[in-house]
C-alpha cells in the first residue's frame, strides 16, 4: 500500500469515527480530537470545514456538535430515509414521521434493542465503509480474509443476523459469504459489475438469512457430495 493510500485510509477512519460520535450526540473538542488522531488542529478544522460541510454543525469555544435546537423536524425525513435504506425500518412497527418525531423529542429511550457486539476495530469500520461504497457504486473489490484472497469479487449485500454482520457476494460464478470480523482488507477496484437480481432476491429470503452462519458448511457439503452409485474415477 502506497503512502497516499495509507493517508487516505487514515482520513476515512478519522471521518467515520467523528461522524459516528456527532450522530451519537457528543460534543467534540477539536484539540482533544487532534491529539487523539495524531494530527494538527488545523487539519481537524479543515476536516470540519471542507469534508464535513454537509453536516449542520455548530461551533463554540473550540467545541463542535450537531445542531439540534429547533431542528428535530428537519431531521425527520433524513431519519426515515436512513431507516429504510439500512433495513432498520422493519424493527419499528408503523415507522412514520409521527413516530420518528416522538422519538427525537423525548428525553429518555422508550425502546430497548438488544446490545450489539463490541465496537469493530478501525479496520473493520473501514472495510464496512468501503463495502457500502462498492455495493452502491457496483464496483468490484479485492477481499482478503482469514485464509482467503478473492480478486474481482462483486459485493451484493451486507446483512446483520444474530448481531453479526455478513457480506454476501458473487465470486467466480459462486455465492461467497464472509463475516465482517474475518475481513482484513477491502481494496476497491475501478472495474464495475452488473447487479445479479436473483442473488439480491435470495439475500432477502428469511430462510437464506437463517442459514448464513452455516453457509460455508452447506456449500462445501454440496460441492464435495458424491452419490453412492457414482462410478469410481
UniProtKB/Swiss-Prot annotation:
Listed GO biological process terms: regulation of single-species biofilm formation
Keywords on record: DNA-binding, Transcription, Transcription regulation
Residue span(s) of domain HTH deoR-type: 11-73
GO molecular function: DNA binding; DNA-binding transcription factor activity
Repeat found in the keyword field: no
Domain WYL intervals: 120-193
Matching Pfam families: HTH_DeoR (PF08220), WYL (PF13280)
UniProt DNA-binding region: 28-47
Protein name (record): Uncharacterized HTH-type transcriptional regulator YfjR
Natural source organism: Escherichia coli (strain K12)
